[in-house]
A protein has these predicted regions:
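N-terminal low-complexity, intrinsically disordered segments
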Residues: 1-86
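Aromatic/basic-lined ligand-recognition segments
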Residues: 1-3, 71-75, 127-143
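Conserved aromatic-histidine-acidic binding/catalytic patches
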Residues: 4, 96-103
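Glycine-rich, often proline-containing surface loops adjacent to acidic residues and nearby aromatics
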Residues: 10-17, 81-99, 127-134
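Beta-strand elements of well-folded, non-transmembrane domains
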Residues: 20-24, 97, 137-139
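Intrinsically disordered, low-complexity acidic/polar segments
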Residues: 25-27, 102, 142
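Short, surface-exposed linear patches
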Residues: 38-40, 97, 114-117
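Secondary-structure boundary elements
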Residues: 102, 106-127
Length: 143
């Protein structure tokens, strides 16, 4: 099948997001008990595809209130796309202008494989509770 690329495609960003259950430690407080171990181990596994690691300012948020907040970003190079984002209970794969479904699907598959490999206890320790594929489009209007 021939890949057709639109000249002026409206896609701004494609986002794959996977969330898993957090552990309740107190009323209103949930944590990912293996998050800090997983960050380093996922970084190791993503190095080939995403060697540039950014720790985001949100990484300073206390663990008890940081659930589902992205704290680390892995890129091919500074400011480059696609990218992978990670936080307690959440991992995303994002792409923009270079988006093609076949490539994006492979990136998702490799990223999820890295997560399941890196997370202490593996796939059985993660209780996936949400998987989302989202597209953000923009169309210019002359008003």
């Amino acid at each position: 099948m021939v890949r057709k690329t639109l000249k002026n495609k409206p896609l701004v960003e494609a986002i794959f997001e996977l969330r898993w259950a957090l552990q309740k430690v107190a009323p209103g407080m949930k944590i990912d008990p293996h998050y800090w171990i997983a960050v380093g181990r996922i970084d190791d596994r993503l190095q080939v595809d995403y060697p540039f690691h950014e720790q985001l300012p949100t990484a300073s948020i206390p663990n008890e209130i940081a659930g589902y907040v992205v704290q680390h970003r892995f890129r091919k190079g500074e400011g480059q796309w696609p990218l992978v984002q990670l936080g307690p209970g959440i991992i995303t794969v994002n792409d923009t202008e270079g988006y093609h479904w076949a490539d994006f699907e492979k990136q998702i598959s490799r990223t999820i494989g890295a997560l399941f490999e890196a997370y202490p206890g593996g796939e059985s320790a993660l209780k996936v509770n949400d998987v989302v594929l989202r597209y953000i489009n923009a169309i210019a209007f002359d008003i």
